[in-house]
A protein has these predicted regions:
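The substrate-binding groove and active-site-proximal loops of carbohydrate-active enzymes
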Residues: 1, 16, 99-123, 139-149, ...
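Conserved interdomain hinge at the start of the Helicase C-terminal
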Residues: 256
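Active-site-adjacent structural elements that line small-molecule/cofactor binding pockets in enzymes
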Residues: 267
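Short coil/turn segments at secondary-structure boundaries
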Residues: 272-275
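Active-site-proximal helices and loops of the catalytic beta/alpha 8
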Residues: 13, 22-37, 41-44, 48-56, ...
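Substrate-binding/active-site clefts of carbohydrate-active enzymes
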Residues: 1-133, 158, 164
Length: 301
């Protein structure tokens, strides 16, 4: 009782093998009506590389040595689609987001990021409809993955429509560019932003005796007027566990930093599951191996 639900919304990219098997009746898949003969078209949902066959990174083996019924080492995609991190190549490297494909919000990336927002792009409508669908299911908020890789104009347009369904619903932006913080709050209409690049990064160094508290007042000063919009944390699925050998090896070392994170201003604070008991993120878990994290690529209990 009293528990609320915030779900992850990934607006920038989908899986390369994306196909919805649970969409409502009458709803078309992303890309279903795309003109794949051109690299960019404002009404397309994806970006394409006409005439080029997608090739996975050399020596990449899906699932490693593990066997699976779907593991036949074959994957056909022609024309190739652009990766989630904007790589216009049919042969992305292993460190690119090769297993994802970029969603097209009407931005012609190859033409100096020229925008085509009138008429409203198809991707805007489809992604807004997904948000509204879940708002109607009474979720309490969305953590928006890589929100800054999606045009702020989309958020300005979409968020009020979702809040018309539920005015109390909250939007949290994963964002790593401090110069865009105010833009995504004021124009984009987000409620909260990740406070990773400044406060988290500084506190991590402090926990390991690699920095000074002297940097913190300057960070807070740079956030004048928006401090209460910054979501503070010491752990999330992307970052290493405090108790992991790759971080501090002892979660009690982070106690002073947790006090700062929770009490430095009126911004919300996030505690990642297992943080309260010193989860060390130990053990190999698939793609990323022994990395001090829990579920960055692989989900386990």
């Amino acid at each position: 009782e009293g528990m609320k639900v915030i779900i992850d919304f990934v607006p920038n990219h989908v899986a390369r093998a994306y196909k919805s098997d649970a969409k409502p009746a009458g709803v078309k898949d992303l890309g279903e009506d795309d003109d794949t003969s051109v690299s960019f078209k404002a009404s397309n949902n994806f970006y394409y590389l006409p005439g080029q066959q997608f090739q996975p990174p050399a020596n990449y083996s899906a699932l490693g040595p593990n066997a699976a019924p779907t593991k036949d080492k074959k994957y056909s995609e022609n024309p190739a689609k652009v990766t989630g991190n904007d790589q216009f190549t049919a042969t992305p490297g292993i460190n690119e987001w090769f297993e994802t494909i970029k969603l097209n919000y009407g931005v012609d990336i190859q033409d100096n990021r020229k925008t085509h927002f009138d008429p409203v792009p198809s991707t805007w409508v489809k992604m807004k409809d997904i948000l509204v669908y879940w708002a109607n299911k009474n979720v309490d908020g969305f953590r928006c993955d890589m929100a800054e890789m999606v045009p702020v104009e989309f958020w300005h347009w979409a968020i009020p429509q979702v809040k018309a369904v539920n005015p109390e619903i909250i939007f949290i932006a994963e964002i790593y560019n401090p110069s865009q913080y105010r833009n995504y709050l004021e124009t984009g209409r987000f409620d909260f932003l990740y406070d990773k690049v400044q406060l988290y990064d500084t506190l991590r160094l402090l926990i390991n005796n690699q920095s000074s508290t002297a940097h913190i007042p300057g960070i807070q000063k740079s956030l004048d007027g928006i401090n209460h919009n910054m979501l503070h944390f010491l752990e999330n699925h992307d970052e290493q566990r405090i108790a992991s050998p790759q971080f501090s090896g002892d979660y009690w070392k982070a106690a002073p930093a947790m006090v700062i994170s929770a009490m430095i201003d009126k911004g919300p604070v996030m505690i990642y599951f297992g943080q309260e008991v010193g989860e060390p993120g130990a053990g190999k878990e698939g793609f990323n191996g022994e990395d001090g994290r829990t579920t960055i690529f692989d989900y386990w209990g």
